[in-house]
């Protein structure tokens, strides 16, 4: 069959659903946006067939594969593919290199009267396309960097701007010591793939200027591409200035209220216990930088707030905890870092002033 597809750009722009027939272990190492893993072989089957291929050659490996994936097992997998195709009529199929696994899957579906295009070159070719686009993307836009103290509401401002890219959202991390979320961060490969998707879409939309939050070389476990780091070094830095009371409110909402809701939605039986343990673990990680005396104090404030919530259901006690962390931990680090880059600051203002300035700078 020659039902091949290699218009990778259209996959990105249309956010095309993808049927990934690689083994689960391959999928976990890296996949694409809108891809669903419905493997033709599970990990154990793939391992055994790989050994056979190495020792006895391709023909024997294919023969073994057909014998292992047959009968009810084969039927269940084909049914899963058909169900996915029925729900996503424009779906595309891929394996690692666009070879035997996706071709055989395509043939099995053809026998059932279902036609699906497979990616030419498979995962490897599409991944190469995305990495190349990621590498050359900085040639097509000018960056603007949005900075500001922790809790100033930078993400809120970014969400209002069509030409922004939420790096913390892509990394599933808030970018601070307390920034980890309940769901695990994506693999580095997935982070890069998703970032490439975003950049391709924004550039295609005609944006010549893109706004990013001020980040370091990594966001949690996700490392920033070198070309973005080097481009951001000379970009204008816009500082969002927010009063401390508002910062406390934003921090309380993100790190306490929303975080606890996430634990509740995830089905944890002991929400406060699980959430508070994660906060206490995070505080232990900063004890060296914070100092023993301040660590003891902030821990006591947190435990008092936790007791108050258990008794009354109120979040108010956490305001003192958030304010202490902002002023005693985050702000000194911010002041030190921003002092070294003060010459890059192009503008300072509140949320509306910053948004207006960036829009003028972006010519939106």
Swiss-Prot record:
Keywords annotated in UniProt: Selenium, Transferase
Matching InterPro entries: Rhodanese-like_dom, Rhodanese-like_dom_sf, SelU
Protein family per UniProt: Belongs to the SelU family.
HAMAP family (UniProt xref): tRNA_sel_U_synth (MF_01622)
Main EC class the enzyme belongs to: transferase
EC assignment: 2.9.1.3
Subunit structure: Monomer.
SUPFAM superfamilies, sorted: Rhodanese/Cell cycle control phosphatase
Signal peptide range: none
Protein name per UniProt: tRNA 2-selenouridine synthase
Pfam short name (any one): Rhodanese
All residue ranges annotated as the Rhodanese domain in the record: 12-135
GO terms of biological process kind: tRNA wobble uridine modification
Entry keyword annotation includes Transferase: yes
Record's catalysed reaction(s): 5-methylaminomethyl-2-thiouridine(34) in tRNA + selenophosphate + (2E)-geranyl diphosphate + H2O + H(+) = 5-methylaminomethyl-2-selenouridine(34) in tRNA + (2E)-thiogeraniol + phosphate + diphosphate; 5-methylaminomethyl-2-thiouridine(34) in tRNA + (2E)-geranyl diphosphate = 5-methylaminomethyl-S-(2E)-geranyl-thiouridine(34) in tRNA + diphosphate; 5-methylaminomethyl-S-(2E)-geranyl-thiouridine(34) in tRNA + selenophosphate + H(+) = 5-methylaminomethyl-2-(Se-phospho)selenouridine(34) in tRNA + (2E)-thiogeraniol; 5-methylaminomethyl-2-(Se-phospho)selenouridine(34) in tRNA + H2O = 5-methylaminomethyl-2-selenouridine(34) in tRNA + phosphate
Protein role: Involved in the post-transcriptional modification of the uridine at the wobble position (U34) of tRNA(Lys), tRNA(Glu) and tRNA(Gln). Catalyzes the conversion of 2-thiouridine (S2U-RNA) to 2-selenouridine (Se2U-RNA). Acts in a two-step process involving geranylation of 2-thiouridine (S2U) to S-geranyl-2-thiouridine (geS2U) and subsequent selenation of the latter derivative to 2-selenouridine (Se2U) in the tRNA chain.
Record bears the keyword Ion transport: no
Gene: selU
Residues annotated as catalytic: 95
């Amino acid at each position: 069959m020659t039902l091949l597809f290699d218009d990778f750009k259209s996959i990105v722009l249309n956010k095309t659903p993808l049927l990934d027939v690689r083994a689960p272990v391959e999928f976990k190492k890296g996949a694409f946006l809108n891809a669903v893993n419905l493997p033709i072989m599970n990990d154990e089957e793939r391992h055994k067939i790989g050994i056979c291929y190495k020792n006895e050659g391709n023909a024997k490996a294919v023969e073994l594969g057909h014998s292992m994936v047959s009968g009810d097992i084969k039927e269940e997998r084909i049914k899963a593919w058909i169900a996915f195709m029925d729900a996503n009529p424009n779906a595309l199929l891929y394996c690692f290199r666009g070879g035997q696994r996706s071709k055989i899957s395509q043939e099995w579906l053809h026998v059932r009267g279902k036609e699906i295009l497979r990616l030419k070159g498979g995962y490897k070719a599409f991944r190469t396309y995305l990495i190349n686009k990621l590498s050359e993307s900085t040639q097509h836009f000018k960056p603007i960097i949005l900075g500001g103290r922790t809790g100033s509401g930078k993400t809120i401002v970014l969400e209002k701007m069509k030409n922004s890219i939420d790096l913390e959202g892509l990394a599933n991390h808030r970018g601070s010591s307390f920034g980890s979320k309940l769901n695990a961060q994506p693999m580095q490969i997935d982070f890069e793939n998703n970032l490439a998707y975003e950049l391709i879409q924004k550039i295609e939309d005609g944006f010549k200027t893109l706004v990013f939050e001020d980040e370091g070389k990594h966001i949690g476990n996700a490392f920033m591409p070198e070309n973005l780091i080097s481009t951001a070094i000379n970009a204008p830095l816009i500082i969002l200035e927010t009063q401390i009371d508002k910062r406390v409110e934003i921090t309380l909402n993100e790190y306490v209220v929303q975080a606890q809701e996430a634990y509740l939605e995830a089905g944890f039986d002991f929400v406060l216990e699980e959430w508070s343990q994660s906060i206490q673990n995070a505080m232990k990680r900063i004890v060296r930088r914070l100092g023993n005396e301040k660590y003891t104090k902030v821990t006591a404030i947190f435990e008092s707030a936790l007791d108050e919530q258990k008794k009354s259901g109120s979040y108010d006690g956490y305001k003192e905890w958030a304010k202490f962390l902002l002023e005693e931990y985050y702000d000194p680090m911010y002041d030190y870092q921003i002092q070294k880059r003060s010459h890059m600051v192009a503008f300072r203002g509140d949320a509306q002033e910053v948004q207006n300035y960036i829009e003028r700078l972006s010519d939106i």
